[in-house]
């Protein structure tokens, strides 16, 4: 089968023929139709996170396609089902985290396109219990980004605890942030969009943001305090330490700051202010299978629509180069042509 393979960190991926995976008990073989491209894939290809991915590696954790083979013990899926393979490739299923609905915190999880091969290939082996079905009225290209960008921002908004009518700030209106604005509006929240690009703020307005602010032109936290008394919650998708600091300062008493982006720096927290003002600081990573089902349903109902750019798998190195330069609008989705 054709695949894009990381053979050495920080080297271009190689488009090559590799062995088609075989499946065993509890697994399915998925014929990949499309796979979204995420910044995490770039980190995997560069090997620049503390825990390195396996090598060689087929990246991709937004792979979607059709079940082509069903292994022994699989009863809830059949050949022809439309499914996606998320970042949470599998978890142990019996630890405290798994049993309490926090499977994304399982210490024995496997991750698609990182610890196991992912969706940058014509076929992908998957743990049947962890693939998620795609609603019939959602195309593969539309569905792919929901498996990471969608569910990640949807879950982040859920954990803010913000209620309909309250204010939430979305920091960074990129691949995740532009989806977050739409989920927030669909959930009945008022939205302040924050970005250093005016074109991104115009997009946020088109997507329903109630207020926008460019922190290069004015103090974003001060703007929010003056306009709405501070936001009830902030979700930071930007990979930027200043964005995290501004988000913290934008929150009213009793509010929540949810961290999603992964900048390399440390972030100092003023303990006195945090305690005195009852500020909650929450880390949020992707979402559970249930979160993903809910996120997909929003998209299927037309309430959330990812801005996508479709490219063939062979263009992956060009896509990575553009991603490094910040030249991607929305999300890139790779497609794989049928043989």
Swiss-Prot record:
Binds 2 Zn(2+) ions per subunit. PROSITE patterns: ADH_ZINC. InterPro entries: ADH-like_C, ADH-like_N, ADH_Zn_CS, GroES-like_sf, NAD(P)-bd_dom_sf, PKS_ER. The keyword Oxidoreductase applies. Its cofactor is Zn(2+). Thermostable. Thermophilic NAD(+)-dependent alcohol dehydrogenase. Bears mainly an ethanol-dehydrogenase activity. Belongs to the zinc-containing alcohol dehydrogenase family. This is Alcohol dehydrogenase. It comes from Geobacillus stearothermophilus (Bacillus stearothermophilus).
